Structures are given as C-alpha cells and as structure tokens.
Amino acid sequence: MEIKLNKYIDHTLLKPEATKQDIINLCNQAIQYDFATVCVNTCWTSFCKELLKNSNVGITNVVGFPLGACLTEVKVFEVKKAIENGCDEIDMVLNIGALKDKDYDLVLNDMKEVKKAANDHVVKVILENCLLTREEIIKACELAVEAGLEFVKTSTGFNKSGANIEDIKLMSKVVKNKAQVKAAGGVRTYDDAIAMINAGASRLGTSGSVEIMLKQENKSNY
C-alpha cells in the first residue's frame, strides 16, 4: 500500500530572505497538497494564520533557531508569542553546548520549560545531529522523552549536514513508542522521503515538498 506522503510533511521555509510573496506561495502549496503544517519563522505566524484559515494545514514555528544557544527564558517567550499568534507546533533547538558539557540538568530544564509554555501544543526538539556523537544523540533523545516532548528532530538544515538513515534508526530505537522522529535537512526527493519513513520517521521537514508530491503523483499514474 502506497504511503500518503502529504500528511508527513512540514512544508518548510526558514531562510532569512523569505518575502511575503514567498510565504504566500508556501501557504498556497500547503493548501493544495494538504500538508501537515507549514514551518516558518515566528515573524510570519499571524500572516500564515490568515492565509491558512480555511484549511486543515497547521503552523509550525521554530524557537531558539538555529543555534539553540539563547536563554531558556527567551525560548519560553518565543513560544508564548508564537502560540498567541496562532501556531500549532513548536520546533525548538536544544542547547547543544550544554549537552556536550554534560550539563544535562540545563538541557532537560530548557526542554521542560518550553513544553510547559507550549502546554498541549506539540513540541519537537532539534538535536543538530551533525554536531553530536552517537552517545550525545542517544542522551538527547532520552532527555527529550523525560521532558515529555512529542518529537525528536534531526537537524535545523542550517548546518553542515542534515538527516541520514542511520540517525533516524538510532533515534527511533531510543525513543521507541514514547516520542516520534522528524527527519529534516537534505530531504529533497521522493526516494529520500520514503527512505526516512521506512527508517522510522513519522514527520518530514522539507522545502522540496512539491517536487516530492509531484513524483508520487507520477508514480501513481503508472
């Protein structure tokens, strides 16, 4: 049975030079394909809310993005403003330096405070796997589960590399049924998307969403 990819996809536009017209195009595409969410920076939340008001498409906002190095209080403020402006899901970046320092209390508290501010909204934590060792990825996943987060996510897409199959399998194994896995960064093709899902991802962050859907439609027509 063919996987319906559209509801796996957070249709993503996070580049700093994004214009209003770019965001309009993003939202129109999301409506056309009925994607799970659009993933945008918080300055666009209200604008997207209006554009998407008659659709089933949600809004994901990034927080502490892309470095994760701001104060927890700043992340909490971002979350509260994002939700106030209409966002549905939060993708936060964890404090990577603190994880490497083994300051697990700080990392855990950072995630817990964001989740507390988000309340019943879905929170995904971005690990930025390309900067982490295997052991650090495992520990970050364990802390995310302890913090009560719904997803662990591979990458911001702003660093040296993004999602890979080995990391998705590892993250899925660690979180088991206690959280889900989002693959992001470098998920550009239909084959990438299917491979990530087969490895254990239940959400995909990609700016190549339309190309992926067109490829699926072409396959369905044969």
Swiss-Prot record:
Signal peptide: none annotated. The active site is at D91 (proton donor/acceptor), K153 (schiff-base intermediate with acetaldehyde), K182 (proton donor/acceptor). SUPFAM superfamilies: Aldolase. Gene3D superfamilies: Aldolase class I (3.20.20.70). It comes from the Bacteria. One of its GO terms (cellular component) is cytoplasm. It catalyses: 2-deoxy-D-ribose 5-phosphate = D-glyceraldehyde 3-phosphate + acetaldehyde. Keywords: Cytoplasm, Lyase, Schiff base. The keyword Lyase applies. PANTHER family: DEOXYRIBOSE-PHOSPHATE ALDOLASE. This is Deoxyribose-phosphate aldolase. It comes from Mycoplasma capricolum subsp. capricolum (strain California kid / ATCC 27343 / NCTC 10154).
